[in-house]
């Protein structure tokens, strides 16, 4: 399901849940060649998951006066019986194919991928959410893989990708876990409108 959100003052967001992740009018999904993969075990004693496979991708364009923030991230949770909750981030190069139908295409050169520059931030933000009390226990045993994304050459930043990855996990678990009220106001607005 694709949901389009108006964030006010020309800010926009799109949220995809449990479906193919491609931008309208752009046939190839936002997959990219993986040049490296960051992997970390978040919980070594995870119980069997009550979650089914879940997929979430969020794209946000947020104008801020004369500048703007842009990013898109997608992740999948795949339950298994390994007894571990594993977090993975698939890293791309910085010169992947250009996307012409992103929310920021008229403002920025947008490319598919999660380059090394943002991979650590994706890890930080998602770990922050997963380490909140009870979250990893509720998710249970399985793998969360960030393997879809786009970034802008001008509008993307490490801090934005950290908050975006946190928000992707928040959307993934929100029907089972109480939302954190200490989230960045822009992302809180996305969460409130996405229900």
PLM feature spans:
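Accessory interaction regions appended to the cores of large information-processing enzymes
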Residues: 1-195
């Amino acid at each position: 399901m694709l949901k389009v959100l108006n964030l006010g003052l020309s800010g926009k967001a799109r949220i995809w849940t449990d479906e193919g992740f491609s931008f309208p009018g752009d046939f190839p999904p936002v997959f990219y060649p993986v040049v490296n993969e960051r992997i970390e075990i978040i919980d070594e004693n995870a119980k069997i998951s009550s979650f089914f496979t879940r997929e979430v991708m969020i794209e946000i364009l947020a104008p801020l006066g004369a500048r703007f923030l842009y990013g898109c991230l997608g992740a999948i949770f795949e339950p298994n019986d390994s007894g571990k909750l594993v977090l993975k981030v698939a890293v791309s190069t910085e010169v992947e194919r250009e996307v012409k139908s992103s929310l920021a295409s008229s403002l920025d050169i947008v490319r598919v991928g999660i380059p090394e520059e943002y991979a650590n931030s994706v890890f930080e933000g998602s770990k922050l959410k997963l380490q909140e009390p009870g979250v990893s226990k509720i998710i249970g045993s399985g793998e969360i893989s960030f393997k879809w994304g786009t970034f802008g050459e001008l509008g993307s930043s490490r801090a934005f990708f950290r908050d975006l990855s946190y928000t992707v996990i928040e959307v993934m678990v929100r029907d089972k876990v109480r939302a954190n009220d200490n989230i960045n106001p822009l992302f809180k607005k996305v969460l409130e409108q996405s229900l």
